[in-house]
């Protein structure tokens, strides 16, 4: 199916988390705690969605940090948490993102950002990273009252764009995001940046690549 509107996840997919990874090493002593935190954040957001808890990305991110610190007997001060989370607003794009996005834009593909970050945070991220001219729209799940991978988010994004959900494709570096989008009827592209495991029980992505340039080429080839 030809798809001329592509949605992009932001944290780790579009923006480089190297500064965040360094903070985790400084606080927790090992980079593996970053993925542990991501897993706990996903768990908390999923529980919040199912039980209809009204919360924000920032609140969940802070709680997830405190939780993994507590479980691993690591003392973490509130100012250290604030310092770590503030770095999300000043992340730079991954090296392959700009040429990959340019390739799509030059071929009349509409590109949009769709993130679990708050509306305020994602706008700060896109502005600081210099990506304003690369996304036609920037969408936070905050306006839908849920979090990815809830199907509601993907359906709501399609409705907001006045597009059939089947005409959209989601690009993400996280298997749960790709699976969530495809469960809702979108196409899915897995940008496997860090040799991450893709759950075999999830819907197989339409496209998989370890860099954005080749992934963009694959999207264009599917549209021919």
Task: Indicate where each model-derived feature is located.
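Active-site neighborhood of HAD-like aspartate-dependent phosphohydrolases
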Residues: 1-42
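Asp-based, Mg2+/Mn2+-dependent phosphohydrolase catalytic module
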Residues: 1-3, 8, 102-105, 114, ...
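Hydrophobic side chains within well-formed alpha-helices
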Residues: 20, 33-34, 80, 131-134
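An amphipathic alpha-helix signature
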Residues: 21, 34, 38, 58-66, ...
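Short, surface-exposed acidic
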Residues: 30-38, 71-82, 165
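A metal-dependent, Asp-based hydrolase signature
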Residues: 46-82
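Short, acidic loop-to-helix structural element flanking the phosphoryl-transfer center
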Residues: 58-59, 76-113, 123, 151
């Amino acid at each position: 199916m030809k798809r001329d509107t592509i949605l992009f996840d932001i944290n780790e997919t579009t923006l480089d988390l190297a500064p965040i990874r360094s903070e985790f090493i400084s606080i927790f002593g090992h980079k593996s705690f970053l993925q542990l935190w991501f897993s706990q954040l996903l768990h908390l957001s999923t529980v919040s969605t199912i039980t209809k808890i009204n919360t924000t990305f920032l609140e969940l991110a802070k709680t997830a940090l405190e939780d993994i610190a507590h479980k691993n007997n690591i003392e973490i001060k509130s100012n250290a948490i604030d310092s770590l989370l503030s770095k999300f607003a000043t992340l730079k794009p991954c090296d392959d993102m700009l040429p990959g996005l340019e390739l799509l834009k030059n071929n009349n593909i509409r590109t949009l950002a769709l993130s679990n970050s708050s509306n305020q945070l994602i706008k700060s991220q896109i502005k600081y990273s210099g990506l304003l001219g690369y996304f036609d729209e920037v969408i936070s799940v905050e306006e839908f009252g849920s979090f990815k991978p809830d199907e509601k988010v993907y359906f709501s994004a399609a409705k907001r764009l006045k597009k059939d959900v089947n005409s959209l494709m989601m690009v993400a570096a996280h298997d749960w995001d790709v699976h969530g989008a495809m469960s809702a009827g979108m196409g899915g592209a897995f940008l496997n940046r860090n040799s991450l495991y893709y759950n075999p029980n999830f819907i197989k992505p339409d496209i998989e690549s370890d860099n954005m340039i080749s992934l963009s080429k694959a999207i264009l080839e599917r549209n021919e």
